[in-house]
Curated annotation (Swiss-Prot):
GO cellular component, one term: plasma membrane
Modified residues (Cysteine methyl ester): 200
SUPFAM superfamilies: P-loop containing nucleoside triphosphate hydrolases
E.C. designation(s): 3.6.5.2
Propeptide: 201-203
Binding site for GTP: 17-24, 64-68, 123-126
Lipidation (S-farnesyl cysteine): 200
Species annotation: Mucor circinelloides f. lusitanicus
Keyword tags: Cell membrane, GTP-binding, Hydrolase, Lipoprotein, Membrane, Methylation, Nucleotide-binding, Prenylation
GO MF terms, alphabetically ordered: G protein activity; GTP binding
Residue interval(s) of motif Effector region: 39-47
Annotated gene: RAS1
Protein name as annotated: Ras-like protein 1
Activity-regulation annotation: Alternates between an inactive form bound to GDP and an active form bound to GTP. Activated by a guanine nucleotide-exchange factor (GEF) and inactivated by a GTPase-activating protein (GAP).
Amino acid sequence: MSKASSFVREYKLVMVGGGGVGKSALTIQFIQSHFVDEYDPTIEDSYRKQCVIDSETALLDVLDTAGQEEYSAMREQYMRNGEGFLLVYSITSRLSFEEITTFYQQICRVKDRDYFPMVLVGNKCDLEGDRQVSSQEGRDLAKNFGCQFIETSAKQRINVDEAFFEVVRDIRRYNKEQETRGHDQFGIQDAPDVASDKCCILM
């Protein structure tokens, strides 16, 4: 087997969002195909999974972080190392939706740039009767961030794989555009704006 065919690219993904929004449930459903019903606040858990995304094998290193404010400093360290982010809120909690902007701004500050590969995730879409955040609000916020939007249900495994796959696709797009910028030595033609060609996806 050649080196090219045996090489598997690793992607460092970070789950970010308030407490109780289902970050751990999404991660465990993706990694283990199992729904965790009880809520046990996470400090830090790391998971790895190899999968094929768009005909290319990828090793996903997923870091599930604490949503509580007291772990903010620890979370910043994870943000520095992360390549792509899932910004998760619960559609049944307006507070968790409003907190997302704070998490987004924290990543921007830590990364020292306005854009990074990410997907905005509205979780618990199976609880439609308890919805406090409309799908349109999610789409609008994602448009403001310049990222994709998807609604998921860890319990019913709706769009779970797609949420993680979209972050990997975004990392690939971002890296390719960075390479294009690097090769554009004379500044004659800029690489396309990362945020300009994003579209929102919804189940």
